[in-house]
C-alpha cells in the first residue's frame, strides 16, 4: 500500500479523494493538532464538559457512547454543537462486528442514532467483506442525508497484547479499504500499512488512507489488562496521522494541560516527519 505520510496535511487535503479525510486534514492544519481524545467517561455531563474544555486542542473526539448511563437527545445535540463550536470531528468507536443487515440497523437506526452525529465510525472485518459493503451501502443510499460527511475506519490492528489482528486479517483490511474507498477513509492501526503486500489488490496513484493509532500515552508503557502504549513521537514516526490518547488526557490532574502537551508533542513529531521546523 502506498503511503503519503511524508506530505503535509495541507498537501494531502488538496488532493484527497475522500471528502471527510480532506476536511480532517484541513482541521488538523488549521488547529495545528493531530490529537484524538478518547473520552471514556460515563455521563453526558462529563462528556460535554471534556469536549468543551479540550475542544480547542484536538482534531477529533472519540466516544464509546454505549458506556454513558444517561444517553439522550441532550447528548447528541450537545456534542454536535461543541463539534461545530471548536471545529473537531466526532468518532464513535463502536467497532461494528456483525452481519451486514444487523450493522446497517445499528448504524442508521436504533436508540443510539449513530449516523446522525458521528462523522467517523469503525468496524472489524472478522465477519468478512460484507460488513464493509453493508456500511458503505447505507452511507451511499438515496435516503442517507449525511453523505460525504461520514466515513469508516477499518480496525486493521490493535495495541492490546496478544492481538489476533495481524497477517491476513490486516492484508484483507487493506483490500476492503481499496474496494470501498469512497466510504473507507483509513485504518486504526499501530503503524503505516505501506509495506502490506496484497495479491488481491494494488494501490492507485491517488490512494491516501488516514492512519489512526490508539494507545498513545506520554507517561505510561501499559496497563494491567494488556494495553501497550506508544508515545506521540513513536506513533507518528511509525506512520500515524492521528494519535489517540485516553487516560493520559482525561484522567490527568489537569486534562486541559495534558491535551496541550499531547498537541505539542504530536505536532512536533508531525513536523519532523514532513521535514518542517
UniProtKB/Swiss-Prot annotation:
Q: Which residues bind substrate?
A: 40, 62-64, 93-102, 229, 247
Q: Name one GO molecular function term.
A: orotidine-5'-phosphate decarboxylase activity
Swapping residue 192 to A leads to an effect described as: In strain: CBS 120.49 / N400
Instruction: Specify whether Lyase is a keyword of the entry.
Output: yes
Question: Which CDD domains has this protein been placed in?
Answer: OMP_decarboxylase_like (cd04725)
Tell me the domain of life.
Eukaryota
Q: Which reaction does it catalyse?
A: orotidine 5'-phosphate + H(+) = UMP + CO2
- The name of this protein is Orotidine 5'-phosphate decarboxylase
One GO BP annotation here?
'de novo' UMP biosynthetic process
PROSITE patterns reported for this sequence = OMPDECASE (PS00156)
| Keyword Signal attached | no
